[in-house]
Structures are given as C-alpha cells and as structure tokens.
Amino acid sequence: MSATLRLTEQLISRPSVTPLDEGCIDLLSARLGALGFVCERMDSGPDSFRVVNLWAKREGFNPLAQENRGQSATKSAANEGEAHTTPIKTLVFAGHTDVVPTGPLEQWHSHPFTPSHRNGVLYGRGAADMKTSIAAMVVAVEEFLAAHPQPGLSIAFLLTSDEEGPATDGTVVVCKQLKARGEVLDYCIVGEPTSVSHLGDMIKNGRRGTMSGKLTIKGVQGHIAYPHLARNPVHLFAPALAQLVATEWDQGNAFFPATSWQVSNMHGGTGASNVIPGELVVDFNFRFCTESTPENLQQRLQAILDQHELDYDLKWTVGGLPFLTTPGELVNAVRGAIHAETGLDTELSTTGGTSDGRFIAKVCPQVIEFGPLNATIHKINECVDVSSLDPLKNIYKGVLERLAGISGMAGASGLAAVADSTSSP
C-alpha cells in the first residue's frame, strides 16, 4: 500500500462531518511536525460549533542569509541587503478536513467512514472532497523534503474543519490572523476536486463571486373573493420578476461567464386556499464575475424594484468576491507538473461554486484549485480511483520542485505561451 493511500484511508476513517475534525488535524500535525513544520492551532467558534484550524509552516532556506551569519559585521550588513532582494517565497496548501453528511446509510454499498475497495476504486465520504488531496500533498512534501532538505521555498498548510458548513470560523479566521501579523503568502493551491474526466484535465484559476438577497414584497392580506380589498404581493412582483429574469447583468469576459441571477426560494400565503397573502418572501442569488461589483448589482436590482413601485424590504449577504489568477508562475508550475505526469494540457476554468479560495485570494496574489475527479463529490458512494492517488501526489511534488527552482521550469516555460492564450468561461 502506498503512503498516499494509507494516509487517505486514515483520514476517511474519521467521521469529520462539519464542524467535527475527529483527530484529522492532530494526525496531520504529527506528520508535519516531524518534517520541521511549526504547527499553530487557530481554533474558532462557540463551544456548540467549535472549528479546528491549523496553520503549519516550514521556512525555506535562504543561502544568502545563511552566508551572512559567517561574515564580518560590515560585510554582513551589505550582504543582508542583497539577501532581502531575493526573499524566500511561500507556497500554501489549503484544504478542509470536514465532510458533508453521509445521507441515508442504507443507500451506501459500504459504510461511508470505513474505507472500502471495489474494482480499483476507494469508497468513503471525503474520498474525493478532499481527504485524498490532503494526503497526497502531505506525502508529496515528505518526499520533496527527503530529496531537498533545504529548499529555497517556504511551505505552509492551512487546514480547517469548517468549509462545507457556514465557513465563518475556518479559513477566513486564519487569513485574518495571518494578515494582522504581516504574514506574506505568494502562492496557494486549494485541494478542491477540479478534474472532470481525467486527473489534471482542469484546474480552477478563479471563482465567481456570490451574493444573496432576501426580498420581502409587502401587500395586504384579504379574502380571495374580495381582491379589491387586498393587494396581492405575488401579482405585484410578477412584472418585476419577469424583468429581473430577462436582464443582462454583464457579458462576462475571457475568463468568466456572464453574471447570473437566480431565484432559489419563493414563499407567500398562509396555506389556506381562500386567503390572499400579505407578503411574498423571495430568496435569490447572484453569481457574478469581475465585470460587476456587489454595489452595482444591488443598485441595478433595486432600481428595477423601484420602477415597479413595490413596497419591499431587502437584505443583502455578500458571500465572496470573485478572484482570478492570470497565467504566471503558479499556473505555469501546475500546468507543467500536470503535463509531466499525465501528458495533458490542462484547461483553465472559473466555473462552479465558491470555495475557501475566495478568502485566501485577499491575502495571496496567486491562487489556484486543483485536485482529483469531482464526479462523485457529496454523493452517495463517493469515491476516487486508487490509480490516481500517487499521480496526484507526483503532480503536487512537481509543483514544489518547479516553484523551488529545482526542476521542470523549462517545461513550465514551454507551456507558458499556451497558458497565456488559454482560458475557459
């Protein structure tokens, strides 16, 4: 059994449904601590929803700074300035140990928290999202440091048990603490399952923003046989709804599809068949690209409501802003490592839902997401091909080597022209 598979199984066997961690981070901290990582717990949240957070970092080796320690005071001061012109960069791997609920246990072919193998496939909750990614990166770092004990690259892990839930006490809390103390991050890989048909066929180099609204249209309740004595909020809202559905909010761009507006829930009435409702509650969501801002979308939507002279209350929640990492050092390193391992020229994409990348992008200039196939995430019988585990580990290790300047940069540079011209809406 490979080290990647063994660690993946150890993580799957822990029933870490949000916000529970069930010892995953203790297990990972022990592995990372043995490699020289300084592990900090940054747990957050009330006792009823306590979230386990880990920030673990191993500083890279700066040969210029090391040389300065043996120089005279005068020469050391001069060389120190030189060393500071080539700072050690930091690669962060971000992931979550929590998983979504299992759903009906009787529908699983094997227990979701008992790693099971059938026909070369590993089954278990979290197999794809995202315990395999975490295990692969930990083993990749172990192998990388065994071969290169003093790399010119700092490596960090940001792990949380609150990504699948409200995500209010997880990555966002750690990022705020890192920013407050001046921690500098250069690159981040979020281990989300991004592959579609084959490992490495797609990476996410950005995500759309998300903003939700709760709209209450006010009417006057009354008897359904006397509509002239009431004001039906459903009827009042209907013309505005049609206009909102037909509105083109923007046209997207080379990296993002156009902003979309969708109603998720609509409720009005008492349940009785002879009562005109007094109010209508509408839940809706924007998934927006970098061509729009929350403020602009709010203003435009409210202008439509006002145009129809509606009496309403509206509450907004901005869940995350869009982010985009254009082709550069990190994208090229990931593309080069994928190509070296699989022969694939990966596709850049910004499709899909939100992730913790939206928080990290505020403190790190280059953020991408890459992990195993996502076909079974959150489903009954979630699984991952065993044959993909070590290739995933090898790709992560290849990224480390490229960013540390150890190998593969010629291949990555060769892909740069492709990366610069490739985009996916």
UniProtKB/Swiss-Prot annotation:
Homodimer. GO terms for biological process: diaminopimelate biosynthetic process; L-arginine biosynthetic process; lysine biosynthetic process via diaminopimelate. It comes from Polaromonas sp. (strain JS666 / ATCC BAA-500). Signal peptide: none annotated. This is Succinyl-diaminopimelate desuccinylase. Its cofactor is Zn(2+); Co(2+). The active site is at residues 98, 163. Binds 2 Zn(2+) or Co(2+) ions per subunit.
